[in-house]
Amino acid sequence: MMQWTSLVQKAQSFIDPANFTIPNLTSSSDRNPSKSSLFRQQFRLPDSQNPLQEITAELILPVSHTSSSASGAQSKNIDRGGNRYAGRLHLSERFLCFSTQPTSFLPSATLATSTYWAGQTNGTGPSGNGFTIPLCSIRRVERLNSQSHIFSLALTTWNGALGKQQAPGFTPQRFTIELVGSRQACERFCDGLKKNLRESMKEIENLRLVVNDCYSEYLLSGAKSKAQSADDPEARPPPDAGLGMLFRYPGDARKLRDRSKMRLWGEYFRENGRNATLIRQPTFHKLIRVGLPNRLRGEIWEVASGSLNLRLRSPKLYEQTLAKFEGQESLAIDEIEKDLNRSLPEYAGFQSEEGIGRLRRVLTAYSWTNAEIGYCQAMNIVVAALLIYMSEAQAFFLLSVLCDRLVPGYYSTTMYGTLLDQKVFESLVEKTMPILWDHLNKSDVQLSVVSLPWFLSLYINSMPLVFAFRVLDVFFLEGPKVLFQVGLAILRINGEELLDVQDDGSFISVLKSYFSRLDESAHPRSENPKLRAITRFQELMVVAFKEFSQITHQTITEQREKHKDAVLENIESFAKRTSIRNLGPESKKLSSDDLGAIYDRYYEVLYDYQQRQKVIEEEKKRQERKKSQRVSVIGPSVDREVGRVGLGPSPTHMDYNAFREFLAATAKWAIADSPGPSRKQSDSGSFRGLGRPTMNKRPSPADHEFMQRLFRKWSTDPDDGLSLQDVVNGIARLKGPRDIMNNITYFFDLYDDNGDGKVDREGILRMSEALLFLSRRGFDGTITPSQSTENLMPGKEEDKLSTGERFLGSVSSFIRRCFEYADPTKKTLEAEKLAETTDNLNSFSIGDDEEDLIDVGDDEVKSESTPSPEGETPGTPSLEPTERKRARSTSEAANPALDPNNPLHITLPTFRMVVLADELLEQFFDNYFPQSFHLSEQGAAAAQLPSLSSNLTTFSNIGAAKQQPTSSGPTVAGASGGIVPPNRGLRGVLDNIVTDGIRMAAEVKKRMDEAQRELERNALNRDDDDEDDEDDDGHHGTAPAIVGGISSWGAGAYGADPERRSVRETDRDLLEGAEVVNIRGKDDVSLLDDKDSHQESSSGQRTAAGSDDKVVSKVVEFES
């Protein structure tokens, strides 16, 4: 049976989620606690401690020293003559813990069950009965002779043996633990204990420093009696027990029976150990309930709360923090200085520089240690109360435990913990006192008006200090449920008077009067003297812990989880309104719905990203610890929801990776085409399939150079990342004004790296890549070719193309036009001037000038029609190597996109001209690009309204809005009339300029061909008819001239590669016809010439029009 039990325990240790450090990100640690968090909460241990070994055991305490004999025979039986407690023994890295309460390692364990103990005091909180002993305080471990397989371990501690002075008749603390389990389980536990004991020996010096600061050590070591005798030179001064040693403790020591309490605690310490080696028995809880002696109060607070264990790790942390940040200033220090003189002014110690200085140093040190919280309201009151009974270092560590574990969220920027407990308190009042709750609601009395200061100041500001400290005594032992029990008891006792109040003022007055009479008798008219001796405060404690004993930690936890979301939403809603209200003037360009959507999405992405990063970091740390030792596999869990606004200080800046996720949730072009490996690995490796539902549904973000430029553009400080203000300003510039010129300028500025208003060759190519990246997922109907454009050239195959294919052609045209209208840089201009001067000098040379003049394109035609010379095959090039190099260099130089020696750039006016010259690009910047950022539904509906630029008259919509299709309208002259067609816009203007240049070049070429052929006829002495020669020359010259003109123009504009030029099928037929003419005989040529000459003579203007049509067809291809 024992083997089966150990097997089940081992299986549970492997199944436990804490082994994998996977917190439930959708819930808090109270709702689904890990084994490690339960263990630390149960024994009040630092966050670095994890459960390594556990076993069922029985604690055997020695008999009382007063009843035991000093004889050797009886001393042998001391280990078996005292109280016996059955429970569970736990081992961590630096502590050995024993508890009689239900263990946190049960399969059905929760944080509430692990902190509940139904003993004589009706719930003693997380500490329970048992001990929490540092391993460094164990002096010796012996295995006793026992029956059969039982392992009996005798532990001897350093209790009372670390000081220089020891009390006469000192007896070391010794107790026995019997392990209950299989032999293998017991040996495994003993092996782990032995290993950790050796590692903890180096911390004995830290234990010595901590113990010497405890008043119990001074009290029981005999140093107090020596100090009272003035003749003893070796007497050491008592340790610092707070400002009360200098300015007296609150209350009358005689009425409080301080001496009697001190004697009771001294006796308990002698029998059960003290400070770090204290064993908790039921008497321990009773002594705390009746009140603590003044000089031992600070030490007992440390032991009960667990801050002593925290101070043991680094005893000099407080002094080191003050020395490290000495002389530095911060915003928290400024707030601290304002509240110093308002901290318990009724106590004399805080009216002097001594008390003010102590308070300043503790608050300042904590603000540097916990920079996220820094300093918050009411923290000065709590610390001032602690300093009355504790030293500065003790108050510093207790404040840390108070803020982080006992009342988390009470002292933060949002005070979400206090507000949450107000909801819990109201729900408990409604449940336990429904009549009073209904009356307060009918009278419109806010319960939080009086209860909020109770919880925030831990009743220090509400009750007289003497009674407030009695509440704190039980609070540090049993936890925050004491605050609710005392509050409910106050309302129950004053219920009859509270039913008569009608407003907040009278409500506060009744309770204030009650607090001022807490020292009076609760039954002044009673004839029973014992009953008459009971004070109102004693009555309050009895009602709190008896009538409201059903208020347990489980009750508080359930109510907190019930109201947590609503409270956080209220806090975050208030923070949202405040943040939006404080945004800059750029936010006025966006609607309130859009601003709200940006805020929600910004913090949702940031919160989710911070959570994943936290878990990934913890996973990495766990893997590192796993490599070094198996016992450290169980890592600390993520107890706090990182990044949520309502929980206090949270990250306010997002880095580039978080910005990618924000864009992916805002614009569909920012979504990756396929999930990246890093995201897959993060989802499967770090979370092991237990990630958040929202994170799993969120698409994977893309990573493009455009998104990086957008991040740098929006960020005011790239090192810190993007703030909410930066994101709002960036989106407002795009979606706010709805101005196409603004959008074009914004896009241009993204690629203006130097800020000089110029975009170079690489920038043009990256612009085109960005356009393709932004348009790869469609346009959602924001880009539609106009009907007039579709009817401009009916019957074209391009009309059957989709919008995406049309946009692809527009981007291609964008690249060509950018390089065509790009300006050369300064160095290029100087080189061109030098080359032009050289060409002018060379133009006066005599030789082959005539051949150069007509070498525009005829060589290609002649080389195809003229037979090759002997010794050359048709495939052999006829050009010399130098001529080929010259041709290649000329071709590259003619294409701006291929010539790296001639850097080019475009300016903003050129970029605007090229964009506005294309209808799809114009719609892209006017509609799609700003509307691609989807924010809110109302914002999307408003985006469908006509923009500012749509009401303007541009080249693309000129006459479109006002043009009415009527049958009887004035005849509009076409291009021949010198009027640009309305729907052609700026493209028509640019294309007509190019067409006129081509037509002029064709005419010049034609006349040069005629002059050349005339010279050839004179040289050959031909007797042909002049009219036939003219017709023949007209036929052979016109077509090649146009073809040559187009070829030379295309090479200059688009490059020398013929595949890059857009040539219509009719032009290709014309080229084939020219080849046939050159091959055929002379007679056939004359017949064709007669036909062509006849057609030319019949319509003198048709040839020019035909040539114009061919050229215009070339320009139409230029648009696509």
Curated annotation (Swiss-Prot):
Q: Show the ranges annotated as biased composition (Polar residues).
A: 960-970
Q: Where is the composition biased (Acidic residues)?
A: 1023-1032
Superkingdom per UniProt: Eukaryota
Q: Name one Pfam family in it.
A: RabGAP-TBC
Which SMART domains does its entry note?
TBC (SM00164)
In the record, what terms sit under GO molecular function?
Answer: GTPase activator activity
Region described as Disordered: spans on this chain: 673-702, 859-903, 960-979, 1017-1068, 1081-1120
Q: Which PROSITE patterns does the record associate with it?
A: TBC_RABGAP
Biased composition range(s): Low complexity: 864-878
Basic and acidic residues compositional bias, start-end:
1057-1068, 1081-1095
Domain (Rab-GAP TBC) spans 291-479
The name this protein carries in UniProt is Putative GTPase-activating protein AN11010
